[in-house]
Design a protein with these regions (language model features):
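Conserved catalytic-core motifs of eukaryotic protein kinase domains, centered on the activation segment
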Residues: 65-72, 107-111, 156-157
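Adenosine-cofactor binding site in Rossmann-like domains, unifying the SAM/SAH pocket
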Residues: 21-45
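NAD(P)-cofactor binding segment of oxidoreductase domains
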Residues: 55, 69-97
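N-terminal Rossmann NAD(P)H-binding glycine-rich loop of SDR-like oxidoreductase domains
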Residues: 2-22
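SDR active-site strand-loop-helix element
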Residues: 6, 30, 55-59, 96-101, ...
Length: 185
């Protein structure tokens, strides 16, 4: 299967391409240098040229705190960029996987989130990822939305790497203990 992956320079996109290749799939990874997802023409041209069987959309504006001061940029990437990809996937009848986030929920759950739980984002990042989910739902019938949290892996920046370093340097680390989540490797 030929799979087109956005956000290949990011932690998740990089690892997705690696995993696809290990499993014998042809992975085509792109980042903003090759395809600016906020530019509908760029998205159309690059995906048509690649002619994939499926798209895994990992590219995103993920700076949660900075998003509060950058609503329009965050929206252009997470909502409009996602819609650009969804439209091309619809036109070419390509299956799409959208990587979303638990930030689409309000954080007040007392049990693990279910796919159909009410989405009620509390911040700009969550709002724009929710808008991306809506763009997928309104444009496609062949799609999967995967909501992830606390991403870690071999590549990129993540919580695990500094904790391991601090543990080696100090022998112990203090962290918040009032959060519940589902780490994604």
């Amino acid at each position: 299967m030929k799979v087109f992956v956005t956000g290949v320079k990011g932690q998740l996109g990089h690892d997705v391409v690696d995993e696809l290749e290990k499993r014998g799939h042809e992975a085509i990874g792109v980042d903003i240098d090759e395809m600016d997802i906020t530019d509908a023409g760029s998205v159309d041209r690059v995906i048509r040229e690649a002619s994939p069987d499926a798209v895994i959309h990992c590219a995103a504006y993920t700076a949660v705190d900075a998003a509060e001061d950058n609503l329009e940029l965050c929206r252009r990437v997470n909502a409009y960029g996602t819609e650009n990809i969804a439209r091309v996937c619809r036109e070419l009848d390509i299956k799409m996987m959208y990587i979303s986030t638990d930030y689409v929920f309000n954080g007040q759950g007392t049990r693990p989130w279910e796919p159909d739980d009410e989405r009620e984002p509390l911040n700009v990042y969550g709002l724009t990822k929710y808008e991306g989910e809506l763009a997928i739902e309104q444009n496609l019938t062949k799609y999967f939305t995967v909501r992830i949290a606390w991403v870690f892996g071999v590549n990129g920046k993540n919580f695990i790497k500094p904790m391991l370093r601090i543990g080696k340097e100090r022998g112990a680390a203090s962290v918040v203990d009032d959060q519940i989540g589902s780490p994604t490797y």
